[in-house]
Amino acid sequence: MITKQQVLEFLKNYDLDNITIATVCSHSSLQIFDGARKEGFRTMGICVGKPPKFYEAFPRAKPDEYLIVESYEDIMNKVEELRKKNVIIIPHGSFVAYLGTENFAEMAVPTFGNRAVLEWESDRSKEREWLLGAGIHMPGKIDDPRDINGPVMVKYDGAKGGKGFFVAKTYEEFDELVDRTQKYTIQEFITGTRYYLHYFYSPIRNEGYTLSEGSLELLSMDRRVESNADEIFRLGSPRELIEAGIRPTYVVTGNVPLVARESLLPLIFSLGERVVEESLGLFGGMIGAFCLETVFTDELEIKVFEISARIVAGTNLYISGSPYADLIQEDLSTGRRIAQEIKEAVRKNQLDKIIS
């Protein structure tokens, strides 16, 4: 992984009055570009081939310029060009997936957030160690598939967007569906309501909901719409579907907004706080936007089954603010909050605390 010192050397040659915010044209890029423009930054969209035409339909979120690459791996050959334009990269889930975690870790361009989180986020066993170390309640983990005696969720390492997930109730079902060439995790299937909680951790603000270092914000929350799981049971009972050879899949196709009972907010903040505090000790902190992927049970317990350590697509619901973000600042999206953090870090001469 590129070192923090190397990144700081690059920043010495930056014109900090003319920073360009850049990301790959996908995932949450519209929101990122819109938020950056609202905070006075130039924007750059990175794309393979011709720029997507749909950006013409959204002029407020259309990037000021494009970097055209032959492939996503080709971004690694454009790092000098990016640095000459004072670029700070905003990583989102698709950016990391398309470029590859190894390339992303080595990319010689200043990047918002702490790249050290990749090691802990992409390995499900390390992710579990992190969350359990923070005192987070997680679904039970089953090490031997022969011990399956009820519904379980099976996830392959690195699976995102719902791909690579399946549910099994017996070892026989597991054995029929599993791809043993991939590394997988078996988790207890928790019944309840799924909530995806969108937080923002700032190491440079010391107001509001403060932690041992910096402060924590809750910006929004959502639930994912999944195909075909959300509609499949209109066709019959689970048993009838299985007999017909139809099994649910969990590919994310969109998102719907949610708010939580106000009485749950103390627990929601506590979860975010514990995860951040644990990250500070493990790898120097998870900076900026992150999401805890949870299930709220009928006993009002919150179980966390995964973490995403950067902006998630569910925040796209709230480009003009959310019921929570509106209580911090009007018209505050996660994309705009990222731009504010960079702007504030430049003003305070603390960019070293938020980039890697």
From Swiss-Prot:
EC number(s) from the headed UniProt entry: 6.3.4.23
Please give the InterPro entries that the UniProt record associates with this protein: ATP-grasp (IPR011761), ATP_grasp_subdomain_1 (IPR013815), IMP_biosynth_PurP (IPR023656), IMP_biosynth_PurP_C (IPR009720), IMP_biosynth_PurP_N (IPR010672), PreATP-grasp_dom_sf (IPR016185)
Which residues bind Mg(2+) per the record? E293, E306
What is one Pfam family matched by this protein?
DUF1246
Annotated residues for binding of ATP: 145-196, 226
The record's SUPFAM superfamilies line, in alphabetical order, gives: Glutathione synthetase ATP-binding domain-like, PreATP-grasp domain
Q: Give the pathway.
A: Purine metabolism; IMP biosynthesis via de novo pathway; 5-formamido-1-(5-phospho-D-ribosyl)imidazole-4-carboxamide from 5-amino-1-(5-phospho-D-ribosyl)imidazole-4-carboxamide (formate route): step 1/1
| Top EC group | ligase
Q: What is this protein called?
A: 5-formaminoimidazole-4-carboxamide-1-(beta)-D-ribofuranosyl 5'-monophosphate synthetase 1
- Organism equals Methanosarcina mazei (strain ATCC BAA-159 / DSM 3647 / Goe1 / Go1 / JCM 11833 / OCM 88) (Methanosarcina frisia)
